[in-house]
Amino acid sequence: METVKLFLDTNIVLDFYTGRLGNDDAQKIVTAGQDSRYELCISILTAINVLYVSGKYAPGLQASDIPKLFSILPMDYQQYCKALSLNINDFEDALQISCARANGCRAIVTRDRALLNCGISFPGILSPEEFLHRIGGTR
């Protein structure tokens, strides 16, 4: 069985580590990621942002904790240039899409409404609820 690379947007990872609103869905998604059918992926940008923000909300989080649960994907100049060519107002969203595409991710899970409705062709840009429904983990 092929492992599906699932890209998590920064907001999902922050929900997981900080207990923000939606933490239940984030917990379920990370639990699903422990199944060998999925590889949970995040960009290096997400890892950096989560460490920065979590200092206030999850002070015990260490940089070494993140790769225990998530594959950290590289970002490079080529992805940066591709992100510039996407017709998206939020450049960070464009970078995330570019990173996910370059690294073979099959879907992006995000709580960001602008990203969910950006109109970019990608195999799947899903809300946490949509993803959990697809795998049978609905509430």
Predicted regions and their residues:
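A generic structural signal for short hydrophobic patches within well-formed alpha-helices
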Residues: 13, 47, 80, 115-116, ...
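Helix-adjacent hinge/juxtasegments
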Residues: 52-74
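Short, flexible helix/strand-to-coil boundary loops that buttress conserved ligand/catalytic motifs
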Residues: 17-18, 54, 87, 119-120
